[in-house]
């Protein structure tokens, strides 16, 4: 079976930047000529509209509360079959489900056997990220954290301090998004306007920032897996 890069984007909490990073990476991959198959954990119908506008393909909900594990795996394999890369956007905090972690993003990653890229809001923190990340890396050994992308980083020096966190924990630091007023405004308005212009607004800027500050080639090179 052919292997393709595939991963789930999760975060410690809601509001960390999952949707911003998901849309930006999808836009960047499309810009590079890749066929991107988007997915969304849970029943959310708003983020899927934004995914489809970016990728030109339907974004598929993966909901382990409403559907059986077999059905979720089947959906994932079917829609990813002709893609160059599969990107799953998580929901809420990584382990937040309806009963402990049941129905959570972590459950979807475990079910599909795909690695996680953790998006962490680093505003107003530096080495205090170490115990937080250590918990997510070690809490479930059957879920692999493929790398970390820091959001709302204040300066290159701030980012260097965050890189030291990843070095000490032996986890890949994939890069960061700098703190930008435009990105925070975009996040606040997502879901309030369903016009086509809003669905794609700011994507070029976002993709450009990720291309500049995230090692997307390293990411794609380390997460090639056969489809489940």
Role assignments for model-derived ranges:
Residues 2-16, 20, 26-112, 120-147, ...:
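ATP-dependent carboxylate-amine ligase catalytic core
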Residues 116-119, 174-176:
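Short hydrophobic alpha-helical runs that function as membrane-insertion/retention elements
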Residues 127-228:
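Internal gly/pro-rich beta-alpha loop/helix module
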């Amino acid at each position: 079976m052919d292997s393709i890069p595939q991963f789930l984007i999760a975060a410690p909490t809601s509001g960390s930047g999952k949707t911003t990073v998901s849309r930006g990476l999808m836009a960047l991959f499309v810009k590079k000529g890749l066929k991107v198959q988007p997915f969304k954990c849970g029943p959310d119908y708003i983020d899927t509209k934004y995914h489809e506008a970016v990728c030109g393909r339907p974004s598929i909900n993966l909901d382990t509360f409403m559907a059986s594990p077999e059905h979720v795996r089947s959906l994932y394999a079917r829609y990813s079959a002709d893609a160059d890369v599969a990107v799953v956007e998580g929901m809420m905090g990584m382990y937040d489900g309806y009963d402990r972690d049941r129905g959570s993003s972590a459950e979807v990653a475990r079910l599909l056997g795909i690695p996680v890229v953790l998006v962490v809001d680093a505003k107003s923190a530096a080495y205090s990220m170490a115990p937080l990340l250590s918990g997510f890396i070690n809490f479930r050994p059957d879920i692999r954290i493929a790398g970390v992308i820091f959001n709302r980083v204040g300066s290159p020096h701030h980012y260097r301090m965050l890189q030291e966190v990843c070095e000490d924990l032996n986890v890949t630091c994939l890069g960061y998004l700098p703190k930008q007023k435009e990105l925070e405004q975009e996040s606040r308005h997502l879901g309030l306007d369903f016009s086509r212009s809003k669905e794609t607004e700011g994507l070029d800027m976002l993709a450009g920032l990720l291309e500049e500050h995230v090692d997307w080639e390293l990411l794609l090179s380390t997460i090639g897996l056969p489809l489940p």
